């Protein structure tokens, strides 16, 4: 268990890497500082993956949450990062197709509802036209401005 302000628990399945606590302003600032560092290297776009909570366990302790739900905290973190880099860097948030369509345990809501401007969706296989249209409409209805679909056999 990590006890710093940034990470509160370790992910045994990922070699003991610490998770950053989405409720920690310092953790969100740290991610933003990493994006700023990449921007300073000349990159104009960055893809952020795993902006989520770990799978639930009894050992998790997020510290003070002020009653803010996990989904609302992720929305606030995404909004803070987008605001910080508005007009200077394009941020993409990457989620699986399943996370976009269902309430996953790591998000509590479908990813399309988290308020990102740019969404990269990864699918295990190509989507049929109806499924793609449904995803596009769902994302647009939630304010997603740009949607990119990456599947095993196509990148659109």
Where are these regions (language model features)?
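Active-site-proximal loop/short-helix segments
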Residues: 44-72
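Short, small-residue-biased leader/transition segments that mark boundaries at the very start
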Residues: 1-3
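Conserved, mostly hydrophobic/aromatic
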Residues: 31, 38
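The substrate-binding groove and active-site-proximal loops of carbohydrate-active enzymes
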Residues: 15-29, 65-69
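Aromatic-lined carbohydrate-recognition surfaces of secreted/lumenal glycan-active proteins
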Residues: 47-49, 70-106, 143-153
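Substrate-binding cleft/loops of secretory-pathway carbohydrate-active enzymes
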Residues: 93-125
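Conserved alpha/beta catalytic core and glycan-binding cleft of carbohydrate-active enzymes
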Residues: 124-156
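Generic structural signal for well-ordered alpha-helices
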Residues: 35-36, 74-82, 132-137
């Amino acid at each position: 268990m990590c006890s710093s302000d940034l990470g509160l628990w370790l992910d045994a399945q990922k070699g003991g890497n610490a998770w950053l606590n989405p409720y920690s302003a310092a953790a969100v600032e740290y991610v933003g500082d990493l994006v700023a560092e990449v921007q300073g290297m000349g990159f104009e776009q960055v893809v952020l993956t795993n902006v989520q909570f770990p799978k639930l366990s009894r050992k998790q302790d997020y510290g003070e949450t002020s009653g803010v739900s996990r989904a609302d905290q992720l929305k606030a973190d995404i909004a803070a990062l987008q605001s910080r880099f508005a007009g200077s860097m394009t941020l993409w948030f990457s989620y699986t197709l399943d996370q976009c369509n269902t309430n996953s345990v790591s998000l509590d809501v479908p990813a399309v509802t988290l308020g990102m401007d740019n969404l990269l969706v990864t699918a295990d296989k190509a989507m049929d036209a109806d499924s793609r249209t449904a995803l596009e409409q769902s994302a647009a209805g939630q304010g997603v401005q740009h949607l990119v679909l990456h599947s095993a056999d196509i990148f659109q």
